[in-house]
Amino acid sequence: MNIAFQLAVFALIATSSVLVIRGHLVFASPDGWSNNKNVVFSGTSLWIGLVFLVAILNSLIS
């Protein structure tokens, strides 16, 4: 269970980093938002899911 928790936290940190970098690139380009809207929404949905997964795993471990 510890390994699953650590992997979930790593995935959350990696997804957060990618979204921070990707967000700046999307809004900096002229047509970035209209072309990459689905990617941003998918990444945000993944991030929210990982937050809940980390919370559930944390409650099981402690």
UniProtKB/Swiss-Prot annotation:
Membrane topology listed for this record: Multi-pass membrane protein
Residue ranges crossing the lipid bilayer per the database entry: 8-28, 41-61
Keywords associated with the record: Chloroplast, Membrane, Photosynthesis, Photosystem II, Plastid, Reaction center, Thylakoid, Transmembrane, Transmembrane helix
GO cellular component: chloroplast thylakoid membrane; photosystem II reaction center
Principal subcellular localisation of the protein: plastid
Keyword Endoplasmic reticulum (UniProt): no
Pfam families noted in UniProt: Ycf9
GO terms for biological process, alphabetical: photosynthesis; photosystem II stabilization
Cellular compartment(s): Plastid, Chloroplast thylakoid membrane
Coiled coil: none
InterPro entries per record: PSII_PsbZ, PSII_PsbZ_sf
Subunit (UniProt): PSII is composed of 1 copy each of membrane proteins PsbA, PsbB, PsbC, PsbD, PsbE, PsbF, PsbH, PsbI, PsbJ, PsbK, PsbL, PsbM, PsbT, PsbY, PsbZ, Psb30/Ycf12, at least 3 peripheral proteins of the oxygen-evolving complex and a large number of cofactors. It forms dimeric complexes.
Classification via PANTHER family: PHOTOSYSTEM II REACTION CENTER PROTEIN Z
Reported function: May control the interaction of photosystem II (PSII) cores with the light-harvesting antenna, regulates electron flow through the 2 photosystem reaction centers. PSII is a light-driven water plastoquinone oxidoreductase, using light energy to abstract electrons from H(2)O, generating a proton gradient subsequently used for ATP formation.
Similarity field: Belongs to the PsbZ family.
Protein name per UniProt: Photosystem II reaction center protein Z
Source organism phylogeny: Eukaryota, Viridiplantae, Streptophyta, Embryophyta, Tracheophyta
